[in-house]
Structures are given as structure tokens and as C-alpha cells.
Regions:
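Transmembrane-cytosolic junction motif
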Residues: 65, 94-121
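Hydrophobic alpha-helical transmembrane segments
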Residues: 62-93
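Canonical alpha-helical transmembrane segments of integral membrane proteins
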Residues: 38-64, 89-93
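Cytosolic juxtamembrane N-terminal segments of multi-pass membrane proteins
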Residues: 1-41, 125
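Membrane-interface amphipathic/juxtamembrane segments adjacent to transmembrane helices
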Residues: 6-15, 108-130, 134
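Charged, low-complexity intrinsically disordered regions
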Residues: 123, 129-131, 136-178, 183-340
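Membrane-helix interfacial "entry" motifs
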Residues: 28-36, 40, 71-79, 83, ...
Length: 340
């Protein structure tokens, strides 16, 4: 997937605007904040080391008689000793202060970075591609509905909601779902990393329907933490063996679900198994689907290296691909016979 020549022209014009440059500089300042703090501590240590070297050298020269003892030298040594004492105390206080307040500042910095990137960088790029689109940085996609299409986890981190503002009311977010193992060597366990989409349900599909991917290990089938049967629901199979091997289907209205799962839809789901780990959920108002691809599409640079390698055209292509995938799913739904 690539950008058209017109899109490239607009994207590069956007990058040269004063507002974009100011926002990018602000992002760079946020990302280099920790590095500046490190430079501050290193500078203090170097100054302290220099004071010890100078003081030690002066004492040696005085002891050897190379420098004469005088009131001036005595005053200089006293001032140097006071400076060393001040630097030691100041360094200790700085370390304690950073230990107490640094983690809180770091969390605020990450929040500020995400909001600034989405509002000032990502949103203008998105609007070049889709003029009516916007990014909601204040709200999350409904957690109750997100849980229907991603594996269960302790923590869920969403990006801002990218809204296309079209007739489908298409919305999408980056989502990272993870848990933290307990014990001496605790670490994060990733359950989902990808995109979750939501569109208005205009299909005559009654009740709830959930389709989740399965995995096989030692002839045992698992569904990787995805939810199973919903209240007043049941698990069903279809006549297609391949589909039954790769997906579990749960619904509350079997007749409506079987009508929806036409050969066209089943064939499409089967074609996705080699390219995507797709999950699907619908109720009578909205449809949700998730693409587990182990990638962030909308995330801000996280460090100096990712800032250095960030490219505006690559970011625009990722945005286009995210909505291309949503369009692919939407087209499949509306091509299904009996649905419009």
C-alpha cells in the first residue's frame, strides 16, 4: 500500500508548516527529558570530581612547598571545601527528590506525549487522508465491548479513538492488553497487541454474535483467553470443517447467526486465518472486530531512536492500512446475501 502523489504532496507540505514543526519540537523535548536529567546528574558528578582533583592538587603543591602558604590560599581551600560539601549535599538531595517524584513525572510525561502526538501530529496527517476524520483523546472505546473481542487481561491500554465520521461511524484504537506475573521475576505477559474497530450495525443480525480464533496444541483446542458463551447464548458449529478448526462461534440467536454465516462470509473468514488473527462481536447496535497483529499503528515515538527513524509518510501509510482493513471487513459484511 502506498500514498498517491497528491497525498504525498499534502503530507510533505504539512510537515513543513510552523505548527507541525513546533509540535514536533515539543515531542522531542518530552522524549529527551530523561536524558537531560541524566546529563544534569553526570554534570554534578563531574564538577564534584573536578573539585576533588583541584583540591587534592592544591594540597599536594602546598605540602611540597611549591605554593606558598598564605591567607589567600587558606581562604581558597576553605571555599573549595564548602563547594565540595555543597555539591555532595545537593547531589544527595537531587537523587532523593528524583526518586520520590520522578516516577510520577514519568507517568505524566507519557500521558502528555501521547496526547500531544495524537492531537498535533497524528490528527493533521489523518485529516489530509480523510478530511472529516478526527481523534478523540479524552475518551476510550467502551471497555465492556472491547473485552468481547480481545483476550481477558489485567490491564488494557488504548490510544485515542480515531473516528472517520462516515456513514458507518467507524472508530478504531490501538490496544495493548497485558497481565503482570507475580513472584520474584515478575514481567508483563502480552495477551493482545493490535487494533480494535467499531462500526454501526446496519445488518438484520439479531441478538449477540461472537467469533473468536482458536489455537491447537497437542490435539487440544484453546481460544487464548477470549470470552466464550455469553448469557443465554450457545456455541454452534457450521458445515465448513476448516472454519470450525480455526474459529469458535457463540450466539444468542442461532437462526439469525446461521443466516449471517453464509458460504461467502465463512470463506472470507477462512481466507483471513493465514494473514490475521481476527475476532468479531456484534450486538444489535454496533459491530466490533479486532486484528491481533502485534503492531502499534498510532503510537507516538517512545525514545530518541524511534524519534530519529520516524517518517511522516510511513505513518500516513499505516493510517491508510488501518482503514483499508476496516473497509475490507465492512465490504465483506455488506456483500453477504440478505444483508445491506
Amino acid at each position: 500500500m502506498d500514498l498517491s502523489s497528491e497525498e504525498k504532496k499534502k503530507i510533505n507540505s504539512l510537515r513543513r508548516t510552523a505548527q507541525f514543526q513546533r509540535s514536533w519540537k515539543a515531542i522531542r523535548n518530552i522524549l529527551t527529558w530523561k536524558e537531560r536529567v541524566q546529563h544534569y546528574f553526570i554534570g554534578n558528578m563531574l564538577l564534584l570530581f573536578l573539585c576533588f582533583i583541584v583540591g587534592g592538587g592544591l594540597i599536594l603543591l602546598l605540602d611540597e612547598g611549591i605554593l606558598p602558604r598564605s591567607d589567600f590560599m587558606n581562604g581558597l581551600m576553605k571555599h573549595l571545601a564548602r563547594l565540595v560539601l555543597f555539591l555532595v549535599e545537593f547531589q544527595i538531595l537531587s537523587v532523593l527528590f528524583y526518586a520520590l517524584f520522578g516516577p510520577g513525572w514519568e507517568a505524566k510525561r507519557r500521558t502528555k506525549l501521547r496526547s500531544l502526538y495524537e492531537r498535533e501530529i497524528l490528527a493533521p496527517i489523518l485529516q489530509v487522508l480523510y478530511p472529516s476524520a478526527q481523534i478523540d483523546t479524552e475518551h476510550d472505546m467502551s471497555p465492556n465491548h472491547v473485552n468481547e473481542v480481545v483476550p481477558s487481561a489485567e490491564h488494557y491500554i488504548q490510544s485515542g479513538i480515531l473516528q472517520l465520521n462516515d456513514e458507518r461511524n467507524l472508530q478504531t484504537v490501538d490496544l495493548y492488553a497485558y497481565s503482570i506475573t507475580k513472584g520474584k521475576d515478575s514481567h508483563d505477559v502480552t495477551h493482545f497487541l493490535g487494533q480494535v474497530y467499531s462500526i454501526k450495525n446496519t445488518l438484520p443480525l439479531r441478538g449477540e454474535l461472537r467469533i473468536v480464533p482458536t489455537e491447537h496444541f497437542l490435539n487440544m483446542e484453546t481460544q487464548g483467553g477470549y470470552l466464550g458463551t455469553m448469557q443465554c447464548g450457545k456455541k454452534i458449529d457450521v458445515e465448513d470443517i476448516k472454519h470450525n478448526e480455526h474459529y469458535n462461534i457463540y450466539c444468542t440467536d442461532e437462526q439469525s447467526t446461521r443466516k449471517f454465516l453464509s458460504p461467502t462470509v465463512i470463506e472470507w473468514f477462512n481466507s483471513m486465518t493465514s494473514r490475521h488473527k481476527l475476532s468479531f462481536y456484534s450486538n444489535e447496535s454496533r459491530i466490533y472486530f479486532a486484528n491481533y497483529n502485534n503492531r502499534y499503528f498510532f503510537a507516538a515515538p517512545k525514545d530518541k531512536e524511534s524519534l530519529r527513524t520516524w517518517r511522516i509518510e510511513e505513518t500516513a501509510i499505516q493510517l491508510k492500512y488501518a482503514f483499508y482493513f476496516a473497509n475490507e471487513v465492512t465490504e465483506m459484511l455488506h456483500k453477504n446475501e440478505g444483508f445491506s
